[in-house]
Structure formats: C-alpha cells, structure tokens
C-alpha cells in the first residue's frame, strides 16, 4: 500500500504580539501534528517582515525579496491554518496585508484548503473568521466548514499558561479535530488536482 503523502501546512498568525494566544494555538497545532497526526506538517510562516502592500514596490512582475520569499512559502504549501484575533469585527491588518501580497498575480492561495482558529474574548474571534471566509471566496480558498474553533481565552479555567502555551486538554482535542478535517480536505483537493 502506498504511503499517505505529507500535507504541508503554512501556519499564519494574525497577531504580531509575542505572547499572543493565537500564536499559542499555532504552536499547539504544530505539536499536535508532530505527536499524533501522521502525514501532516505545519510550518509557521512569519508575516511580520512584510512591508505594507504598495504596488510601487512591484518591478517588472517581481516583488521585494521578503515578499518573494513569503509568496514562495504560500505557493509551496498544500493548505493553510490561519490563527487570528478579531479586531473591530475583522481580521488584523498584518494578516490582511499578507493575504493581499500573496494574492497579487499570480494568486498563490488558489484552490487550496484552509482552516481558521481564533482565541480572544467574548465570541472568541468568530467574526474575524467569518470575514476571512468572505475574503477567501475571492482568493478561491476552500475552508473547512466544520468543526469551527473559537476560543474564549479569558474564560475560566485558564486555557494557556503564563508563557502562552495551550494547556487545556479539551481545547487541544478540539484543535486536533480541526487539523484532521483540514488534512482530509487537503487530500481530497490534491486528489482532484493531480
């Protein structure tokens, strides 16, 4: 029997804050994949070095080196895991900037699977996820429908330790379910594309 292909996931965090709970979710997802999901690897893709989108920086169809490197990582990924807080009912400015850079011709997001997770107060970042889904329509991203993952990071008992490490086992299991759904959709889409 042929070995299952390795699904390469690009993990993007909408928060640039060092102690971000959303970055904590990405770190936990990487650990979960390493420990308990065969055939799936997550690479954290740092969006903080990207300049603000400015088409004056595009020269003869090329982009600044940091943007070219980012676009290459997005292009090489089989799918995406977005972790973003909610800012004013939307995704963060840095995440939107990264999305915009990778959507410049040619759009390197297209026809790939994606999942979203978010941690925050109140609704746990849910409205940012719904806005990201709307943006994904234009990008031809295919988001998993279920399970949805919104985490009220401030609700007791604590979900993260003082270093931003996810410690809550139930939350880890919910995150694992998202990853398995993402893996299944990515494999399905790869099968259609190859």
UniProtKB/Swiss-Prot annotation:
Keyword Oxidoreductase: yes
Keyword NADP tagged: yes
Gene Ontology molecular-function annotations: FMN binding; NADH:ubiquinone reductase (non-electrogenic) activity; NADPH dehydrogenase (quinone) activity
Source species: Solanum tuberosum (Potato)
A Pfam match: FMN_red
Quaternary structure annotation from Swiss-Prot or TrEMBL: Homotetramer.
Cofactor requirement: FMN
Family the UniProt entry places it in: Belongs to the SsuE family.
EC number in record: 1.6.5.2
Catalysed transformations (reactions): a quinone + NADH + H(+) = a quinol + NAD(+); a quinone + NADPH + H(+) = a quinol + NADP(+)
Keywords: Flavoprotein, FMN, NAD, NADP, Oxidoreductase
Entry-linked InterPro entries: Flavoprotein-like_sf (IPR029039), FMN_Rdtase-like_dom (IPR005025), NAD(P)H-dep_reductase (IPR050712)
Record-given protein name: NAD(P)H:quinone oxidoreductase
Job description of the protein: The enzyme apparently serves as a quinone reductase in connection with conjugation reactions of hydroquinones involved in detoxification pathways.
PANTHER family xrefs: CHROMATE REDUCTASE, NAD(P)H-DEPENDENT FMN REDUCTASE LOT6
